Design a protein with these regions (language model features):
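Residues at the starts of beta-strands that form the adenosine-phosphate
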Residues: 69, 123, 143
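Acidic, PIN/NYN-like endoribonuclease modules and their adjacent C-terminal/linker elements
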Residues: 138-156
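Conserved Lys-Pro-Asp/Glu-containing loop-to-beta segment of HAD-superfamily phosphomonoesterases
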Residues: 109-132, 137
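Alpha-helical substrate-recognition element adjacent to the catalytic core
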Residues: 2-107
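Short beta-strand/turn micro-motifs composed of small residues
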Residues: 74, 127-128, 148
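Short, charged, surface-exposed secondary-structure boundary motifs
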Residues: 107-111, 153-156
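Conserved beta-strand scaffold positions in the cores of enzyme catalytic domains, especially
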Residues: 98-100, 126, 144
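Short, aromatic/basic amphipathic alpha-helical patches
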Residues: 83-92, 117, 135-141
């Protein structure tokens, strides 16, 4: 496991990174097809109310035991239910920021967000399930982590 305390800032994706399962796949497909903040909010509300997600337990453990500031970055529209889910998953004393980009261009805007943070935080770790986003961010000289390697039952 990587020591997250060695970094100045952690930038972490949510869907298919910290939480995963059928509903996160449905969220992804619905956002890509309809680009509807309202539909996204309804699906997030259902996940929040009925706990319709699985948590990447190893990643949760790493984040909860790190003192490094963390920003959760999502391409979806802003939703209070995203914040509620993160509060349920993380330890009560673990602070975080949530940044909802509401964009179709995550492969451009996520690395751009990291680039903007580099002036204040020279050592950043990006945790994201997207190969494209990790590759674009790694080109900036930022460390990246593929969270799929931390999932239970993952086989190489």
């Amino acid at each position: 496991m990587r020591n997250l305390n060695l970094y100045d800032l952690i930038v972490c994706d949510i869907d298919d990174t910290l939480i995963y399962g059928f509903w996160t796949d449905l969220m992804s497909y619905s956002w890509n097809m309809f680009h509807s903040p309202r539909l996204s909010s309804v699906l997030m509300a259902l996940q929040d109310w009925f706990n319709l997600y699985r948590v990447n337990e190893k990643l949760r453990y790493m984040i909860n035991n790190s003192k490094t500031p963390i920003v959760f970055l999502t391409v979806r529209a802003e939703s209070k239910h995203t914040f509620n889910i993160l509060n349920k998953i993380l330890a009560p004393e673990r602070g975080f920021e949530l940044m909802a980009l509401g964009t179709d261009y995550g492969f451009i805007e996520k690395p751009e967000f990291v680039w903007q943070q580099l002036s204040d935080n020279p050592d950043i770790l990006l945790i994201d399930d997207s190969d494209c986003i990790r590759a674009n961010t790694e080109d900036l000289g930022v460390d990246v982590l593929d969270p799929r390697l931390l999932l239970e039952g993952f086989e190489v």
